[in-house]
Amino acid sequence: MPEAPPLAGLRVLEGAGSLAATYAGFLLSEIGAEVVKVETAGVARQTPGEHVLARGKRSIALDASGWRALLGHVDAVLTDDSVPPPDPDPDLVRCRVFAWGRTDSRLPPEESLLAAATGVQALQWSWSRCPVWLVTPMIGYMTGILAALGVSAAFFARHRGAPGQAVDVSGVCGALALNSGTFVSGAGHRGSLSLGGDPRGVYPTYGLYPTADGWLFVGALTQVFWTKLLTALNRLDLLAHPHLQGEPMTFFDADVRALVRAELEPVFATRSTVAWVEALRAADVPCGAVGSRADFLRDPEARALGLAVPVEDPVLGPTWQPAAPVVFSDTPAPPPRPAPLPGGDTAAVLAEAPSWRRRFRASSGDGPRACLEGIRVLDLTSFIAGPFCPLLLAELGADVVKIEAPGGDPFRFQLFGFVGWNRGKRSLVLDLKRAAGREAFLDLVRAADVVVDNFRPGVMERLDIGRDRLARLNPRLVHTSITGYGSSGPLAALPGFDPIFQARSGLTVAQGGDDAPVLHMIAYNDYSAGALGALATVAALVARERTGRGQHVDVSLFRTAFAAQAAQMILFPGRPPDPRGGRDYLGPAASHRLYACLDGWLCVAAGSAAETAALGRLAGIPLTLDDPPDGPAAGALAQVLAGSPRADALARLAAAGVPAAPALAAAEIFGAPWLRASGCLGALSHPTLGPLQVVGPFIHLEATPATLGRPAPLLGADRASVLGELGYDAAQIAALVEAGAVG
């Protein structure tokens, strides 16, 4: 009989209405916590997505006295901007999820304003080099994952003697987390991934192409995949082209991009999307069909793998919804339960609550200085999704050792990006193809708590360090794998990159609207999978405190693509459409739109009739909430704002009571005083790059604070300290280096 889910026995009270906070509650429920949601009885949920996010929770109606009484019986509470934070309690984890965090901003908790003020809109690739209004609330989702991670880490720390504590997670930090590899500033560098970006993809070998009947994403990011692609297209002649002699990730120049597209577009236009997917998969080229969210939920491959599951909702009837966000080998997630009726569990919960006992209570001894203090993590990952997971674990206090092949992480060439994804870690080079390198790795495993890998399934087994062997060697080991299509199943061997799942999951179609699909500059599925991997790893550590055993944790980009758009991922007859964007999309209405000023852009988000009327007075024309983004009212306002410096325009809007924020460029992020007040910007000194400004830490914990940690390591810089801690002396280490087993 399987064990109970990782967070079984822990109770969370959710008093919040924002996407970020309710998504955090959804995730905690999905990994086993009993989440009690406070709602107004008899008031229908406003959107289909609310039925997904309320799934698995219990719903109660409470007045203020009932709220205070219930706080004394739960382990954690989730609140947002709409609810005052609860009083301190030595046994209670108090998580506040709020938009602007520790800044002094008085703006409403609007995703669009956050996206503007944190550089997210300005970074998005566009045809006209303007900022872009993003239709999918990626910031809210990432903030929710970080909040769930903070609560789980605080649970783990409390079990080890830490008190209950305040956990603060802001939308500002959520936005910056989604750009941890982009927002790195040093001498001569202020982030370049967005410069010259193409909405079809920054590299021509790694982008969207029209086919005979639709669109296709092709992911030939590396030289190996580029050669396989050209072989499949019968265009190996391009390997000899004088302008295409570098790695595909060097094909950044506009002329080179145009050259490659001119050669490839006519080829892809000759066949259907389905035919190309079949042919490219057979050639081991990463690829994916572009489709809608409804297509994704109907996808036969997704349903066969159990990633889209049927749920009978008491209001909506038969629906298809996302499966659990992650898979635990030994403590499986509970099967999905439909959303309760608002307030439907009030009587039962109030009857049970007096008998509830908190799982952990604060001890009188000294607790850990950080949530994961004393936890050793072996990081075998590369690129983005993999490294982001142990980065978050390092922020929470884990000792992370990045184990690299002799050539290093392939993304080391992304110098500042690598720094952003790999701070807080030490580096050890091991050649796992050599027996002596494997033995050194196995010695590390014996003393480790966690291994994180993002190899394709089968690679570790071929190296004789597969999960079964590691589990026998260290039964307490938590082994987290982050893959494209999962660790098992008929698709497991396929290569997977973030944009494949942007394309398949409807993300690109939603942003492009009736125009061409649009790739997001933010590697959204990568970052989400890494953050969900960190959450699942900590949850597995919590479970280990109960079971005494580790387990395997399976995170995939395919599964993440459902979970990271959970509120949009619901299918039922008559489902209303989600918002859609368009070409260089500026916003859905004149009152919710990006506008150009003399020296930059700003974002307006008037949410009431009064605010919209005030906006109209500035424009000198009547304006309503229904006025379109390209109508006369929007044109009049655009003309007024275009003649003003941005600071003056923002001051006029603020004086009129209209919410607005600057659409900051990447170069402006570290110079914004209010962003520095958020606590999510920091400084490090790198051994070769010198002083750097970076983003993080992303979660603020009162009693066991998170930290930026050390700068990203040089390749193999820590071999003496890491191996020395295992008892290797200098002569042994030198012999391993001489043999090529250690770098």
Residues covered by each model-derived region:
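Short, well-structured beta-strand/strand-turn elements
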Residues: 34-38, 281-296, 356, 400, ...
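N-terminal helix-loop segment corresponding to the beta1-alpha1 unit
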Residues: 1-163, 311-312, 337, 341-552, ...
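Short solvent-exposed loop/turn micro-motifs enriched in small/polar/acidic residues
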Residues: 45-46, 199-202, 319, 412-414, ...
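Substrate-binding/catalytic subdomain of NAD(P)-dependent oxidoreductase enzymes
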Residues: 154-197, 276, 292-293, 540-582, ...
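Mid-domain beta-loop-alpha active-site segment that forms a flexible
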Residues: 137-152, 171-179, 221, 225-228, ...
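Terminal low-complexity tails and localization/encapsulation signals of metabolic enzymes
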Residues: 1-11, 193-194, 210-211, 291-379, ...
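A short glycine-threonine-serine/GTX helix/turn-capping micro-motif
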Residues: 131-142, 164-166, 196-200, 204, ...
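Aromatic-enriched alpha-helical interface/lid elements that frame and gate functional surfaces
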Residues: 76, 205-283, 287, 294, ...
